[in-house]
Amino acid sequence: MYTASDFKKGQPRWCPGCGDHFFLASLHKAMAEIGVAPENVAVISGIGCSSRLPHYMATYGMNTIHGRAAAIATGAKVANPNLTVWQVSGDGDGLAIGGNHFIHANRRNIDLNMILLNNRIYGLTKGQYSPTSPRGFVSKSSPYGTVEDPFRPAELCFGARGHFFARCVATDAQGTVEVLKAAYEHKGASVTEVLQNCVIFNDGCHEAVYNKEGRKKNAIYVKHGEKLVFGENNEFGLVQQGFGLKVVEIGKDGYTIDDVLVHDAHCEDNTLQLKLALMGNGDGFPVALGVIRDVDAPTYNDAVHAQLAEVSAQKKYHNFEELLETNDIWEVK
Protein backbone atom coordinates (compact mmCIF):
# COMPACT_ATOMS: atom_id res chain seq x y z
CA MET A 1 0.00 0.00 0.00
CA TYR A 2 1.46 3.33 -1.09
CA THR A 3 0.57 6.95 -0.39
CA ALA A 4 1.09 10.01 -2.56
CA SER A 5 4.05 10.96 -0.35
CA ASP A 6 5.89 7.82 -1.46
CA PHE A 7 6.14 9.32 -4.94
CA LYS A 8 7.02 12.89 -3.96
CA LYS A 9 10.48 14.32 -4.36
CA GLY A 10 12.06 17.77 -4.30
CA GLN A 11 10.53 21.23 -4.41
CA PRO A 12 8.66 22.01 -7.64
CA ARG A 13 10.02 25.09 -9.40
CA TRP A 14 7.06 26.31 -11.36
CA CYS A 15 5.29 29.64 -11.20
CA PRO A 16 2.65 29.94 -8.45
CA GLY A 17 -0.68 28.92 -9.95
CA CYS A 18 0.86 26.95 -12.82
CA GLY A 19 -1.25 24.01 -13.93
CA ASP A 20 1.78 21.74 -13.54
CA HIS A 21 1.39 21.93 -9.74
CA PHE A 22 -2.17 20.60 -9.91
CA PHE A 23 -1.28 17.83 -12.33
CA LEU A 24 1.74 16.72 -10.31
CA ALA A 25 -0.39 16.31 -7.18
CA SER A 26 -2.89 14.20 -9.11
CA LEU A 27 -0.12 12.08 -10.62
CA HIS A 28 1.30 11.37 -7.16
CA LYS A 29 -2.15 10.30 -5.97
CA ALA A 30 -2.85 8.20 -9.06
CA MET A 31 0.44 6.35 -8.75
CA ALA A 32 -0.29 5.58 -5.11
CA GLU A 33 -3.68 4.13 -6.05
CA ILE A 34 -2.23 2.19 -8.99
CA GLY A 35 0.18 0.56 -6.56
CA VAL A 36 3.25 -0.07 -8.72
CA ALA A 37 6.43 0.24 -6.64
CA PRO A 38 8.39 3.45 -7.32
CA GLU A 39 11.46 1.45 -8.36
CA ASN A 40 9.41 -0.16 -11.15
CA VAL A 41 8.34 3.19 -12.63
CA ALA A 42 10.15 5.53 -15.00
CA VAL A 43 8.98 9.06 -15.85
CA ILE A 44 10.58 10.41 -19.02
CA SER A 45 10.21 13.95 -20.36
CA GLY A 46 11.62 16.26 -23.00
CA ILE A 47 12.29 19.98 -22.58
CA GLY A 48 9.94 22.67 -21.30
CA CYS A 49 8.22 23.80 -18.12
CA SER A 50 6.20 20.59 -17.83
CA SER A 51 9.27 18.49 -18.58
CA ARG A 52 10.74 19.32 -15.18
CA LEU A 53 8.21 16.87 -13.76
CA PRO A 54 10.57 13.85 -13.43
CA HIS A 55 12.65 15.86 -10.95
CA TYR A 56 9.67 15.78 -8.57
CA MET A 57 8.97 12.05 -8.78
CA ALA A 58 10.57 9.53 -6.39
CA THR A 59 10.84 7.06 -9.27
CA TYR A 60 13.36 6.53 -12.00
CA GLY A 61 13.26 9.51 -14.32
CA MET A 62 14.92 11.19 -17.27
CA ASN A 63 14.65 14.85 -18.27
CA THR A 64 15.89 14.29 -21.81
CA ILE A 65 16.20 16.29 -25.04
CA HIS A 66 13.75 18.50 -26.86
CA GLY A 67 10.97 16.56 -28.56
CA ARG A 68 12.57 13.16 -28.08
CA ALA A 69 10.85 11.94 -24.91
CA ALA A 70 8.65 9.44 -26.76
CA ALA A 71 11.65 7.97 -28.58
CA ILE A 72 13.64 7.53 -25.38
CA ALA A 73 10.59 6.17 -23.55
CA THR A 74 10.16 3.66 -26.38
CA GLY A 75 13.71 2.40 -25.87
CA ALA A 76 13.20 2.10 -22.12
CA LYS A 77 9.99 0.11 -22.50
CA VAL A 78 11.27 -2.24 -25.19
CA ALA A 79 14.51 -2.87 -23.28
CA ASN A 80 12.68 -3.49 -20.01
CA PRO A 81 9.06 -4.51 -20.67
CA ASN A 82 8.39 -4.93 -16.95
CA LEU A 83 8.95 -1.21 -16.39
CA THR A 84 5.91 1.08 -16.16
CA VAL A 85 6.82 4.06 -18.34
CA TRP A 86 5.17 7.48 -18.20
CA GLN A 87 6.17 9.96 -20.88
CA VAL A 88 5.48 13.64 -20.20
CA SER A 89 5.59 16.46 -22.76
CA GLY A 90 4.10 19.89 -23.28
CA ASP A 91 2.22 20.90 -26.41
CA GLY A 92 5.33 22.50 -27.91
CA ASP A 93 7.78 19.76 -26.97
CA GLY A 94 5.36 16.98 -27.88
CA LEU A 95 3.67 18.25 -31.05
CA ALA A 96 6.24 20.52 -32.74
CA ILE A 97 9.77 19.12 -32.67
CA GLY A 98 8.36 15.93 -31.13
CA GLY A 99 5.41 15.55 -33.48
CA ASN A 100 6.84 12.65 -35.47
CA HIS A 101 7.71 10.71 -32.34
CA PHE A 102 4.20 11.34 -31.01
CA ILE A 103 2.43 9.91 -34.04
CA HIS A 104 4.76 6.94 -34.46
CA ALA A 105 4.56 5.94 -30.79
CA ASN A 106 0.79 5.81 -31.30
CA ARG A 107 1.04 4.00 -34.63
CA ARG A 108 3.34 1.35 -33.19
CA ASN A 109 1.14 1.02 -30.10
CA ILE A 110 4.04 0.93 -27.68
CA ASP A 111 2.94 0.36 -24.08
CA LEU A 112 3.59 3.92 -22.90
CA ASN A 113 1.47 6.24 -20.79
CA MET A 114 1.84 9.46 -22.78
CA ILE A 115 0.86 12.70 -21.02
CA LEU A 116 0.39 15.86 -23.09
CA LEU A 117 0.23 18.98 -20.89
CA ASN A 118 -1.51 21.50 -23.14
CA ASN A 119 -1.45 25.21 -22.26
CA ARG A 120 -1.31 26.35 -25.90
CA ILE A 121 1.95 28.27 -25.45
CA TYR A 122 5.71 27.91 -25.15
CA GLY A 123 6.28 28.87 -21.52
CA LEU A 124 9.94 28.10 -20.82
CA THR A 125 11.10 30.20 -23.78
CA LYS A 126 8.84 33.03 -22.64
CA GLY A 127 5.63 33.10 -24.61
CA GLN A 128 5.83 32.01 -28.24
CA TYR A 129 2.79 30.48 -29.91
CA SER A 130 2.70 26.68 -30.00
CA PRO A 131 1.19 24.08 -32.36
CA THR A 132 -2.05 24.17 -30.33
CA SER A 133 -2.41 27.98 -30.18
CA PRO A 134 -5.61 29.08 -31.96
CA ARG A 135 -5.57 30.99 -35.24
CA GLY A 136 -5.17 34.71 -34.58
CA PHE A 137 -3.41 34.17 -31.25
CA VAL A 138 -1.19 37.13 -30.35
CA SER A 139 2.14 36.22 -28.78
CA LYS A 140 5.76 37.35 -28.76
CA SER A 141 6.40 35.36 -31.91
CA SER A 142 3.09 36.37 -33.53
CA PRO A 143 2.55 40.04 -32.57
CA TYR A 144 -0.17 40.46 -35.20
CA GLY A 145 -1.77 37.07 -34.60
CA THR A 146 -0.95 33.62 -35.92
CA VAL A 147 -2.02 32.79 -39.45
CA GLU A 148 -1.96 29.04 -38.81
CA ASP A 149 -4.61 26.56 -37.78
CA PRO A 150 -3.68 24.58 -34.66
CA PHE A 151 -3.16 20.89 -34.19
CA ARG A 152 -5.92 19.17 -32.26
CA PRO A 153 -4.18 16.39 -30.28
CA ALA A 154 -7.07 13.95 -30.62
CA GLU A 155 -6.94 14.20 -34.41
CA LEU A 156 -3.24 13.37 -34.41
CA CYS A 157 -3.76 10.44 -32.06
CA PHE A 158 -6.71 9.03 -34.01
CA GLY A 159 -5.07 9.70 -37.38
CA ALA A 160 -2.05 7.69 -36.23
CA ARG A 161 -4.43 4.81 -35.41
CA GLY A 162 -4.15 5.45 -31.68
CA HIS A 163 -6.14 3.15 -29.42
CA PHE A 164 -6.48 5.25 -26.27
CA PHE A 165 -7.29 8.92 -25.85
CA ALA A 166 -8.48 10.68 -22.72
CA ARG A 167 -8.75 14.27 -21.58
CA CYS A 168 -8.81 15.96 -18.19
CA VAL A 169 -8.43 19.41 -16.65
CA ALA A 170 -5.46 19.98 -14.37
CA THR A 171 -7.59 21.58 -11.63
CA ASP A 172 -10.01 18.63 -11.58
CA ALA A 173 -8.15 16.26 -9.27
CA GLN A 174 -10.74 13.48 -9.25
CA GLY A 175 -11.17 13.49 -13.02
CA THR A 176 -7.42 13.54 -13.58
CA VAL A 177 -6.76 10.62 -11.24
CA GLU A 178 -9.50 8.58 -12.92
CA VAL A 179 -8.13 8.99 -16.43
CA LEU A 180 -4.53 8.38 -15.32
CA LYS A 181 -5.57 5.09 -13.75
CA ALA A 182 -7.45 4.16 -16.92
CA ALA A 183 -4.40 5.06 -19.01
CA TYR A 184 -2.26 2.77 -16.86
CA GLU A 185 -4.75 -0.10 -17.19
CA HIS A 186 -4.76 0.21 -20.98
CA LYS A 187 -2.36 -2.17 -22.70
CA GLY A 188 -0.61 -0.15 -25.38
CA ALA A 189 -0.01 3.52 -26.12
CA SER A 190 -2.30 5.79 -24.14
CA VAL A 191 -2.58 9.55 -24.71
CA THR A 192 -3.97 11.77 -21.97
CA GLU A 193 -4.41 15.42 -22.89
CA VAL A 194 -4.28 17.63 -19.80
CA LEU A 195 -5.85 21.07 -20.20
CA GLN A 196 -3.83 23.41 -18.02
CA ASN A 197 -3.28 27.11 -17.52
CA CYS A 198 -0.15 29.21 -17.96
CA VAL A 199 -0.66 32.12 -15.59
CA ILE A 200 2.17 34.17 -17.10
CA PHE A 201 1.92 33.84 -20.88
CA ASN A 202 -1.54 32.43 -21.64
CA ASP A 203 -3.73 32.99 -18.61
CA GLY A 204 -7.30 31.81 -19.06
CA CYS A 205 -6.60 29.62 -22.09
CA HIS A 206 -9.04 26.97 -20.81
CA GLU A 207 -11.18 29.32 -18.76
CA ALA A 208 -14.51 27.78 -19.78
CA VAL A 209 -13.71 24.49 -18.01
CA TYR A 210 -10.96 25.41 -15.55
CA ASN A 211 -13.19 25.68 -12.48
CA LYS A 212 -15.94 23.44 -11.16
CA GLU A 213 -18.79 25.79 -12.04
CA GLY A 214 -17.52 26.22 -15.57
CA ARG A 215 -17.27 22.47 -16.08
CA LYS A 216 -20.89 22.01 -15.03
CA LYS A 217 -21.98 24.22 -17.93
CA ASN A 218 -19.29 23.70 -20.53
CA ALA A 219 -18.00 20.14 -20.14
CA ILE A 220 -19.33 16.62 -20.48
CA TYR A 221 -17.82 13.72 -18.57
CA VAL A 222 -17.90 10.67 -20.81
CA LYS A 223 -17.90 7.17 -19.38
CA HIS A 224 -18.13 3.93 -21.31
CA GLY A 225 -21.65 2.52 -21.27
CA GLU A 226 -23.27 5.68 -19.89
CA LYS A 227 -25.57 8.26 -21.47
CA LEU A 228 -23.91 11.36 -22.93
CA VAL A 229 -25.63 13.91 -20.71
CA PHE A 230 -24.37 17.16 -19.21
CA GLY A 231 -25.48 20.38 -17.57
CA GLU A 232 -25.93 21.37 -13.94
CA ASN A 233 -28.78 18.85 -13.65
CA ASN A 234 -27.89 16.65 -16.63
CA GLU A 235 -30.65 18.37 -18.52
CA PHE A 236 -28.82 18.29 -21.86
CA GLY A 237 -27.81 15.35 -23.99
CA LEU A 238 -26.06 14.46 -27.23
CA VAL A 239 -28.00 12.78 -30.01
CA GLN A 240 -26.92 11.71 -33.45
CA GLN A 241 -27.96 13.96 -36.31
CA GLY A 242 -26.99 12.60 -39.69
CA PHE A 243 -23.25 12.04 -39.57
CA GLY A 244 -22.82 14.49 -36.71
CA LEU A 245 -23.93 15.23 -33.16
CA LYS A 246 -26.55 17.58 -31.81
CA VAL A 247 -27.14 19.07 -28.35
CA VAL A 248 -30.72 18.70 -27.16
CA GLU A 249 -32.58 19.59 -23.98
CA ILE A 250 -34.08 16.44 -22.55
CA GLY A 251 -37.85 16.68 -22.23
CA LYS A 252 -38.22 19.38 -24.89
CA ASP A 253 -38.98 19.26 -28.60
CA GLY A 254 -39.90 15.60 -28.28
CA TYR A 255 -36.47 14.45 -27.09
CA THR A 256 -36.32 11.96 -24.22
CA ILE A 257 -33.44 10.29 -22.39
CA ASP A 258 -33.94 7.31 -24.72
CA ASP A 259 -32.80 9.43 -27.65
CA VAL A 260 -29.48 10.30 -26.01
CA LEU A 261 -26.42 8.40 -27.20
CA VAL A 262 -24.57 5.94 -24.97
CA HIS A 263 -20.80 6.38 -24.98
CA ASP A 264 -18.87 3.46 -26.47
CA ALA A 265 -15.17 3.93 -25.75
CA HIS A 266 -14.42 0.39 -26.93
CA CYS A 267 -15.79 0.75 -30.46
CA GLU A 268 -13.00 0.14 -32.97
CA ASP A 269 -14.55 2.61 -35.43
CA ASN A 270 -13.45 5.96 -34.01
CA THR A 271 -15.93 8.15 -35.93
CA LEU A 272 -18.15 9.15 -33.01
CA GLN A 273 -15.25 9.14 -30.55
CA LEU A 274 -13.41 11.70 -32.68
CA LYS A 275 -16.50 13.88 -32.93
CA LEU A 276 -16.68 13.86 -29.13
CA ALA A 277 -12.99 14.68 -28.81
CA LEU A 278 -13.23 17.68 -31.15
CA MET A 279 -16.22 19.33 -29.46
CA GLY A 280 -16.07 22.51 -27.46
CA ASN A 281 -14.12 25.09 -29.41
CA GLY A 282 -16.80 27.76 -29.51
CA ASP A 283 -19.10 25.50 -31.50
CA GLY A 284 -21.92 25.32 -28.95
CA PHE A 285 -20.86 21.87 -27.77
CA PRO A 286 -19.34 20.97 -24.39
CA VAL A 287 -15.70 19.93 -23.98
CA ALA A 288 -15.47 16.15 -23.62
CA LEU A 289 -13.56 14.97 -20.53
CA GLY A 290 -12.76 11.42 -19.49
CA VAL A 291 -11.80 8.33 -21.48
CA ILE A 292 -12.96 8.97 -25.04
CA ARG A 293 -11.34 5.97 -26.74
CA ASP A 294 -10.03 2.72 -25.21
CA VAL A 295 -9.59 -0.15 -27.67
CA ASP A 296 -7.46 -3.27 -27.29
CA ALA A 297 -4.76 -4.05 -29.87
CA PRO A 298 -1.41 -5.89 -30.01
CA THR A 299 1.51 -3.87 -28.64
CA TYR A 300 4.83 -3.22 -30.31
CA ASN A 301 6.91 -4.27 -27.32
CA ASP A 302 5.09 -7.61 -26.97
CA ALA A 303 5.46 -8.27 -30.70
CA VAL A 304 9.19 -7.49 -30.64
CA HIS A 305 9.91 -9.87 -27.77
CA ALA A 306 7.70 -12.60 -29.25
CA GLN A 307 9.54 -12.30 -32.55
CA LEU A 308 12.93 -12.43 -30.85
CA ALA A 309 11.95 -15.58 -28.95
CA GLU A 310 10.57 -17.26 -32.07
CA VAL A 311 13.59 -16.50 -34.25
CA SER A 312 16.07 -17.31 -31.49
CA ALA A 313 14.51 -20.75 -30.98
CA GLN A 314 15.17 -21.57 -34.64
CA LYS A 315 18.84 -20.57 -34.56
CA LYS A 316 21.90 -22.58 -33.59
CA TYR A 317 23.08 -19.78 -31.33
CA HIS A 318 20.42 -18.17 -29.20
CA ASN A 319 22.26 -15.05 -28.11
CA PHE A 320 25.45 -13.07 -28.63
CA GLU A 321 27.28 -14.73 -25.73
CA GLU A 322 26.74 -18.20 -27.20
CA LEU A 323 28.09 -17.01 -30.54
CA LEU A 324 31.24 -15.60 -28.94
CA GLU A 325 31.94 -18.80 -27.05
CA THR A 326 31.85 -21.14 -30.06
CA ASN A 327 34.87 -22.86 -31.61
CA ASP A 328 38.33 -22.01 -30.26
CA ILE A 329 38.35 -19.41 -27.53
CA TRP A 330 40.96 -18.34 -25.04
CA GLU A 331 41.23 -16.02 -22.10
CA VAL A 332 43.90 -13.33 -21.91
CA LYS A 333 45.24 -12.71 -18.40
Report the location of each language-model feature.
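Short beta-strand segments
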Residues: 44-46, 88-89, 113-118, 193-195, ...
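Active-site diphosphate/adenylate-binding microenvironment
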Residues: 4-65
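Conserved thiamine diphosphate
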Residues: 130-185
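Flexible, low-complexity linker and terminal segments
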Residues: 9-10, 200-333
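ATP/pyrophosphate-binding catalytic subdomain of soluble kinases
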Residues: 164-221
